[in-house]
Amino acid sequence: MAGVFERVKKIIVDQLGVEEDEVTMEASFIDDLGADSLDIVELIMAFEEEFELEIPDEDAEKIRTVGDAVNYIQERV
C-alpha cells in the first residue's frame, strides 16, 4: 500500500501545492486539501496517467478522499 499511497501523495502535493503532512488517507480533497472541481478533474487525470488506468466519470465522482483514490487504484493495478 505504501507504494501507491506515496505516488498518490506526490501527485496531490504537486497538483494542489499542499504540504506532505496534510495528505493523509482520511483527507478530503475538497474539505481538507482545498481542491475545487477543476482540481479534482486534474487529479483524476494525473492518477490515470501515473497508474496507466482509466477512471470512468461515475467512479471518479465517488473518489472524495485520498484513501478513496488509493483504494480504487490498488484494486485495479
Curated annotation (Swiss-Prot):
**Pfam families, sorted:** PP-binding
| Record localization | Cytoplasm
What pathway is this protein said to act in by its record? Answer: Lipid metabolism; fatty acid biosynthesis
Primary location group: cytoplasm
- Carrier domain residues are 2-77
User: What cellular-component terms does GO give this entry?
Assistant: cytosol; membrane
Sorted keywords for this record are: Cytoplasm, Fatty acid biosynthesis, Fatty acid metabolism, Lipid biosynthesis, Lipid metabolism, Phosphopantetheine, Phosphoprotein
What Gene Ontology terms describe what this protein does at the molecular function level? acyl binding; acyl carrier activity
User: What InterPro entries would the database entry show?
Assistant: ACP (IPR003231), ACP-like_sf (IPR036736), PP-bd_ACP (IPR009081), Ppantetheine_attach_site (IPR006162)
Q: Which residues carry this modification: O-(pantetheine 4'-phosphoryl)serine?
A: S37
As given in the record, the signal peptide range reads none
What is stated as this protein's family in its record? Belongs to the acyl carrier protein (ACP) family.
Briefly state the protein's biological role. Carrier of the growing fatty acid chain in fatty acid biosynthesis.
Return the NCBIfam families for the record.
Answer: acyl_carrier, PRK00982.1-2, PRK00982.1-3, PRK00982.1-4, PRK00982.1-5, PRK12449.1
List the PANTHER family. ACYL CARRIER PROTEIN (PTHR20863), CARRIER DOMAIN-CONTAINING PROTEIN (PTHR20863:SF76)
Official protein name in the record: Acyl carrier protein
Q: Which organism is it from?
A: Carboxydothermus hydrogenoformans (strain ATCC BAA-161 / DSM 6008 / Z-2901)
Query: What is the taxonomic lineage of the source species?
Result: Bacteria, Bacillati, Bacillota, Clostridia, Thermoanaerobacterales
